Amino acid sequence: MKRRKFSSVVAAVLIFALIFSLFSPGTKAAAAGAIDQAAALENGKEQTGAMKEPEQVKWYKVTPGATDIQKNSHMALTVKSDSVLNVSVYPSKEKALKDETFEMYRSFTAEDGKSEVIFPYAWSGPYYVKVEYLGEEEPEDGGTAEAAAEAKYTIGYKGTKKQPSDLEEEEACPVEMSVDQKKSGKGILDKLRSIRDEQLSQTAEGKELTSLYYKAAPFIVAKLALNKTARNEIYQDLVTLKPLFDDVSENGASSSYKVTEKDQKAINRLYDKALQSVPSFLKEEIKKQADRLNMKQLQGKTAGAILTENNIAAKSEVQTTKVIFKVKDNKSLSSVHNEMKGFSASAQSKKDISNVKKAKKLFDNLYSFELPKDEKQNGAYTASAKRVKSAAATLSKMSNVEFAEPVQEYKSLANDIQYPYQWPLKNNGENGGVKNADVKYEPANTLLSKRKLNDTLIAVVDTGVDSTLADLKGKVRTDLGHNFVGRNNNAMDDQGHGTHVAGIIAAQSDNGYSMTGLNAKAKIIPVKVLDSAGSGDTEQIALGIKYAADKGAKVINLSLGGGYSRVLEFALKYAADKNVLIAAASGNDGENALSYPASSKYVMSVGATNRMDMTADFSNYGKGLDISAPGSDIPSLVPNGNVTYMSGTSMATPYAAAAAGLLFAQNPKLKRTEVEDMLKKTADDISFESVDGGEEELYDDYGDPIEIPKTPGVDWHSGYGRLNVMKAVSAADLQLKVNKLESTQTAVRGSAKEGTLIEVMNGKKKLGSAKAGKDNAFKVNIATQKQDQVLYLKATKGDAKTSYKVVVVKGKPSGTPKVNAVKTKDTAVKGKANSKAMIRVKNKSKKVIASAKADAKGTFSVKIKKQKAGTVLYVTAVDTDKKESKEAKVVVEK
């Protein structure tokens, strides 16, 4: 039989017409007896098989060994046959019996009679493979179908290592078409996938429709692949239905779009073509469902009403694409815009970079802008990845631009074996990053591996967590989980966001699978408050926070945001009062304002950094930002078993939450405020000042400039700095506590483990050092420091090494200096005052006649001319805050 090249977009469009024909058909389950007889497949060994009847199924299972898992990240399963065979791979027997798997793990024998599924080693196995015979194609001339022949095939798999860049995205549309058709086809394909993945997958009816899609697709595309006229007709209908697809994808069951007469005719034509393409047994199944709903009488109905009848409701998420660029030092954004006027580039590139004049200033000379919308597509954003890359390349060639590159909100890539790609744990400086700009996971892990730690409960209040993945097995407390969306105890993730967050926190290390989480002692409480589209109301979230606190969580991760709510604020206070540390994402708007609940006083707000150790372009910043952590291109687990790159403060927050959990694991008696303070005071300073002196300008609602407030030791964009886990856990290990240091004090005091070496630094200059004694107390003598001076206290003992930020606060004014007796023969006024105080000697008229600084111990000697007996002098001390003491009156003696 001649095989034909297929188009997934054509199949998807045709099958979408069947959405309206679905009427509670009931999900078909696999026969338990058949799956129990599944044949075992071995790595590198092929097997043969044969089936005689349509809809016949053969089962196989794969149980990868430890060596295979450590060596390979995926298996490449191949089925070869001249017949039409559907192939599905499942992560477990339970999933196989329910026919639940991801689209990328379904395939069918194509043009060359070969089907390949790349499946990740992300579950503990065994994995199950279903091979299904679908019968033969209907003849194109309408004649009698060929008698079903025996379907012979070969099946086998090989282990393979897929690096992140090796993962392939779904094929857009291999069918031959014009450029305009490719654009339309790709755009509509994205909408249809959104409808299928975010809406149909949520109901039994939707799953049955999807199952029907996989059965019918091979036959539909085979009919159309070689028929150009039919394809053109399909695309005309596709364009007709585009507004319907757009509205349903965006609004789900809330769609108010009414099916028009033109829509109805397009649906009818698509439906008829589908019926003409499939074998008899599928044709009857499709017709039965269409007749039940009277599919050809949909005109005038709203899409939302039709979807509601079928229990399908979800909302997709729209994404944008940006370019980020840095203007060279001593240059400005206007200089780039002026250079563009005479710059040689293609018309498309010039159009794409035209929005540079509207670029948003992130900080210093770093800017971002969005490519202009394509007006030909009704204002829809259609810029391709190729166009974005080209725009960045064009900017990079300009003399006033230091660099430019595309900024992507998330990027799907591949899957311990993927540890080299976890730059937040170990940044090697690759892909434009800065070496060692990471959270210092490896030295922290080395230190903690020698210590006895307690398990710590961390609640992920999110979309749920997929606990079936091997890297999260035993890490998720499903017995403590709850679903506030479905109002049950099944907190399984149906969106992916919560699993990604949980992987960052607690994925098992050194087990060969997938990736490494930051906190080996974390146990995740999955609390589902967001639905399959990633949205939820304040009441659900508030209840989730309270629930997590009541279940014993020491840390709550809130990678979500929205408007202020008194209900939510109450829940935050409730948890804080129970000594729960709450980490909340600062927001992804790139604005000078924190989102809520990050702006609440009851949480630790977390911003995001990138590989270059700078605040990420999307990260909200400003007043109240506590700390930053890696949040750009962060790899972690998603429910389909792969490790996926995502960007956002949602990804930065779990690093801070995991680090907080480690401190509680070291000492469960710590207060949440102590943990937060330790994380902030040990963070790495990543702030920098503009070389050309330019500063970010802020404006109020009336357009008047606002002065950026200055807080010593805190950066406007990154808070206290980028998370440093090694310093934080070392501080906890050393039991380090530092007393407040006032500008009038001459010693830094605190406590630490006996023998801990304490050094006080002002930049690279050491001001003093001492060791903690048997009573754990330390005192480091230093000269008095000015108010707001930022010092760093280095503490070291064994493997534990930390640097703790100390900001000098305003001290009490200097006391009246103690002055020695002054005689007529003396040429100096001597005495004691505060360390480094400026001593002023005044005459009877209170005019300063001499001055000098006291030394580090407060001893002073101010040179004066010899005075007559009975002369009255006044002596004062001016401290580092420039506060002058009361006068000490001295009468010169003989």
Swiss-Prot record:
Q: What induces it?
A: In stationary phase.
**This enzyme's EC code(s):** 3.4.21.-
Q: What's the protein called, per UniProt?
A: Cell wall-associated protease
Q: Which family does this protein fall into?
A: Belongs to the peptidase S8 family.
**Entry PTM:** Proteolytically cleaved to yield CWBP23 and CWBP52.
**Where on the tree of life does the source sit, at the highest rank?**
Bacteria
Gene Ontology terms: cellular component: extracellular region
Fetch the Pfam families from UniProt: Big_6 (PF17936), Peptidase_S8 (PF00082)
Q: What role is this protein assigned?
A: CWBP52 is a serine-type protease that could be involved in proteoglycan peptide bridges.
**Compartments reported by the entry:** Secreted, Cell wall
Instruction: Give start-end of the signal peptide.
Output: 1-31
Q: Which PANTHER family match?
A: CELL WALL-ASSOCIATED PROTEASE (PTHR43399:SF4), SUBTILISIN-RELATED (PTHR43399)
Name the UniProt key words of this record, in alphabetical order: Cell wall, Cell wall biogenesis/degradation, Hydrolase, Protease, Secreted, Serine protease, Signal, Zymogen
- Domain Peptidase S8 intervals: 422-729
MF terms from GO for this chain are: serine-type endopeptidase activity
Query: Where are the active-site residues found?
Result: D462 (charge relay system), H497 (charge relay system), S650 (charge relay system)
Activity regulation: the record says: Inhibited by PMSF.
Keyword set includes Glycoprotein: no
Question: Which EC class, in a word?
Answer: hydrolase
The disulfide bridges present are none
Please name the CDD domains in this protein's record. Answer: Peptidases_S8_Thermitase_like
What gene, per UniProt, encodes this protein? Answer: wprA
Q: What happens when the gene is disrupted?
A: Cells lacking this gene have no discernible phenotype with respect to sporulation, motility or growth. Significantly increased amounts of BglS, Epr, Vpr, YclQ and YwsB; decreased amounts of AbnA, PorE, Csn, YncM, Yxal and YweA are detected in the extracellular proteome.
